[in-house]
Each structure stands twice: as C-alpha cells, then as structure tokens.
Amino acid sequence: SMTSTNLWGDQKAAVAYRIDPSSFLGEHRVPEIPYAIYMILGYDFTGFHVRFRDISRGGVRVILSNDENYVHNRQTQFQENFNLAFTQKLKNKDIPESGSKGTVLMKQGKNDKANLAFSQYVDSIMDICLKAPGVPESDKEEVIFLGPDENTAHLMDGACNYVHDRHYGYWRAFTTGKSNKLGGIPHDTYGMTTRSVRQFVEGTQRKLNLKEKECTKLITGGPDGDLGSNEILLSKEKIVGVVDGSG
C-alpha cells in the first residue's frame, strides 16, 4: 500500500510514492522485506529507492540506455535496484547505517536530461521527507541519505546544497562523495573502498597459504574508476590482464 505521496502537491518536479514493501513483496521470494520503497515517476525517467532500515545509506545510479538495451533495462530496473540495495545492506553490516540503493532509468532518447532527472528525483523525495504542501502528514520522521554511483558522482555537491536550501535538517550528511568544503571525504584519494576489498583478498590468501607476490590476477573494471585504480596501486600480485569497458 502507498503510505505517502506528493501527487497532490502543486509544485512537484516529479511524482513520488512511498510504498509499504510488505504489501506486495510478502508473496514473492525475496531474502528480506525492505523498510521502505520509493517509486518516482518523472517526465524523462523512472526512479526507485529501496532501503532496509530507517537509517540507511547507499548510492544512486543513473541508467543510460541505447536503443538495443532500453527495454531490458526497463524490465529489470526494480529487481536490479532491490538486489543492489540488499547487497549494500550486507556491505554495511559493520556500521550503524543499513543499506539502500537508488536507480534513475532515463527514457529512450533522453540520456541528455540525466542531470535534470537526478535533481527531480531528489526534489520529489524531499517533498515527502519535508511534508511539502499537499503531502499527507505523518508523525514518523523520514530520513534519506544518498551516495554517488554510476553517472552521479559529479552531482553530490549540488544535491547537498539543494536540500540545504530546502531546509532539510540532515543536509550535511545527505550525500557522501561531496567536496571537502561541504564536509566530504575523498574516498578515492584514500582508497577506502579498495582497502576494504583488499582485506577479503588478503584473508583468502592467508587461509590458502598463498604469497601475494606469487599470485597472478586478471582485473575487470580497470584503472578508470577509483576501485580498480587503487587496487593496482595497493596490490602486489602479478597483473596479467585488465579489462575496462570505459576504455
């Protein structure tokens, strides 16, 4: 069932629905029922946001399609979003925040509107969090945090500043991946994600009595992103190949 919406607001940038997941996921085979699901419908995009606890964090990615894969992306968007959020929940097991994930699927031929779509995605979610005019009143506080992902890393500062302008109480923490001047920590500079992954690799090597310098490996993902580039810098294995779709 729908628990909140900005449908009746007269200044909405997109229509957002907050949905009780137990009302429709209970009969399906999912590993766990999320805490909340948002569905956001914009002129040029369809968006979702799934979180597994009231306080959760995870990235939001913009999905850009070509003529060949748009239908597939549209049909699998929610399932992919759910899987990403559940995976983020597992990743966040050792920190106070649970996991969440968001996706913004651009409609066919509308990839050039991606930045605007992300802004509208944030704006419509804020309508519900801030109980904008036309949004049903609720005694329960709604808290949303976002992070960078595919095609959104450059938008974190703007999102942080925007929710500040809308007087969101948690604006400083609203996005990760923002610039230092807004309180962000450059995780790529410190290799934060890579160092976490390396613990699994090194733990496996210890368990199997393998010496790091004697191991060979093939990297998929490549040096273009912060994870692959820092993996190359931090590791001592012999790299025999790198596959990077971005070139």
Regions found by a protein language model. Name each.
Residues 179-247:
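Glycine-rich phosphate/diphosphate-binding loop of Rossmann-like nucleotide-binding domains
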Residues 1-187:
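N-terminal ligand-binding/catalytic initiation module
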